[in-house]
Amino acid sequence: EALHACDITPELSLGLVFMADEECGNDYGLAHVLERHAALPEEQRFLRADDFYIVPDSGSPTGADIEVAEKCLCWLKVDVSGVQCHASTPHKGRNAFVAGAAAVLACMELHKDFPRRDALFDPACSTFVPSRHDANVPSVNILPGHDTFYVDCRLLPGVEPEHVLDAARRRLTAVAEHHGVRIDVAIEHCQRASETAADSPVVAALRRAVTDIYQVEARPVGIGGATVAALLRQQGLPAAVWSCIDSTCHQPDEHSSITATLKDAQVFAHVLMQR
């Protein structure tokens, strides 16, 4: 609207993509868009390898961080099968909840199997965080025979999800034998690590714009979070993730700054005006 109001024709053309499902895997969002795009005749395709792709889905409070790399997102699902019985006769059952608790602690030791560090990222290591736990029994007086939990893994580039799965199975086999239960572990969801060259044209253009608008020295960084930029990079499209945000997502008092949003728009306009 501002470009039209000022009758300005920028050096670069502007395209906006709005998509759904970013929080739940992108199957019905950008992944769907890219799948349909690949099916178009060559002359109708609108995504080009020499375009700039900027995803405003991550950043820092100062605006200095330009995300160029993402860890692999790998979710493990762990199913523990024991024997259900009345809680007053625990000797008749196999408590899957207790075995599951031991399995949680075993999964938290996975970092010892993958100790490599990369200073581009914060934190600089692969992370293994037990997160969601499914409901087991509806009543307090029931010893649970089944327990399910999930582990959120963020893996540095070069750490293969299949190797993490193998390591988890080795550790959980010992837990299963000790508690007399069966433990199955599988990859529930996986988004591979992705990277855009730190000296790519889109990053260079963003650095110039951020320096002029925010008066800070922009720098390339890597993150553990997963954004739709990974899907673009997997298609050979150079994507940079940038915005000025307070990084309060998924926590109490989640918020954004209108002032920062307006200045972010100035950064995007700056990129459009560069030759």
Question: For each of these PLM feature ranges, what is it?
Answer:
Residues 1-69:
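Acidic/histidine-rich catalytic neighborhood of metal-dependent amide-processing enzymes
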